[in-house]
UniProtKB/Swiss-Prot annotation:
InterPro entries reported in the protein's UniProt record: PCA_45_Dioxygenase_B, Xdiol_dOase_suB
Lineage: Bacteria, Pseudomonadati, Pseudomonadota, Alphaproteobacteria, Sphingomonadales
A GO BP annotation: catabolic process
Protein known as: Protocatechuate 4,5-dioxygenase beta chain
Cofactors that this protein relies on: Fe(2+)
EC main group: oxidoreductase
Length: 302
């Protein structure tokens, strides 16, 4: 049967994609960010770590959806998803190849589990989906695995609650485990961490909130899932609510997990950046060395 072997989190800051495209990923500003991702890139190439399929949880930024249609949860069931034109032409990255059989199976299972999914048989994917792929897989001619895009509305109020997202992750795991094909499946939760793009608090970053969120995501995700929207807004900025998508990833893993790697960097553009590798405790691999990396212009200690 298929199984969820790994959960990965990653910010999806669009400037990361621009740094790759402009050849500035190794300069003084961006170099530490890409250095922090290198252990994940190396890890995923090791035998047994490369997924057959990634369920990639992200939010669309007015590319596939706009104010005319705002699905709370959607799932891409197509064969192929093209990079979206976000105003400067599509990112020069490979098309995303889907896994329709698994995607339809998950959609059916989730709907029968009382999650009202929007099924997308045609959809372009923006930086929310493609930047994490670039940060972890680099610049291949083709992405090395199939990807099921899983958009979540965190742009237009009301977004789903953390509790609902955590429960959705659990249902995703059950759906995957009932699929008969032998597949290594990852669930990636993207977005965040603390940031605010507009208004009087534009540029807000809250390191204390972010690091506490990381710790709770590992040790007590159920309690973390009870955090109300207003707390995300107050403490992590208007865009910090993207972190509910990390709870979908965490819900797809069992209660006890092992954190293989955690990277935190501030600032990346105007955002706090986080990336993690989590695996079920019973089947987890060896943690990376170092296990936790912190960097950035605003962090005195590495």
């Amino acid at each position: 049967m298929a199984r969820v072997t790994t959960g990965i989190t990653s910010s999806h800051i669009p400037a990361l994609g621009a740094a790759i495209q402009t050849g500035t990923s190794d300069n003084d500003y961006w170099g530490p960010v890409f250095k922090g991702y290198q252990p994940i890139r190396d890890w995923i190439k090791q035998p047994g770590n490369m997924p057959d399929v990634v369920i990639l949880v992200y939010n669309d930024h007015a590319s596939a959806f706009d104010m005319n249609i705002i699905p709370t949860f959607a799932i891409g069931c197509a064969e192929t998803f093209k990079p979206a034109d976000e105003g400067w032409g599509p990112r020069p990255v490979p098309d995303v190849k889907g896994h329709p059989d698994l995607a339809w199976h998950i959609a059916q299972s989730l709907i029968l589990d009382e999650f009202d999914m929007t099924i997308m048989n045609q959809m372009d994917v923006d930086h929310g989906c493609t930047v994490p792929l670039s940060m972890i897989f680099g610049e291949p001619e083709e992405w090395p695995c199939k990807v099921i895009p899983f958009p979540v509305n965190v742009v237009t109020y009301p977004p789903p609650s953390g509790k609902r997202c955590f429960a959705l992750g659990d249902s995703i795991r059950a759906a995957v485990e009932s699929f008969p094909e032998d597949l290594n499946v990852h669930v990636w939760g993207t977005g965040g961490m603390s940031h605010q793009l507009q208004g009087p608090r534009a540029g807000l970053i809250n390191k204390e909130f972010d690091l506490n969120f990381i710790d709770k995501l590992i040790s007590d995700p159920e309690e973390l899932s009870k955090m109300p929207h207003i707390q995300y807004l107050r403490e992590s900025g208007s865009e910090g609510v993207e972190l509910v998508m990390w709870l979908i990833m965490r819900g797809a893993l069992p209660e006890k997990v092992r954190d293989l790697y955690t990277f935190y960097h501030i600032p990346a553009s105007n955002t706090a950046l986080g990336a993690m590798i989590l695996q079920p405790e019973e089947t987890a691999g060896t943690p990376l060395e170092p296990r936790k990396v912190m960097s950035g212009h605003s962090l005195a200690q590495a």
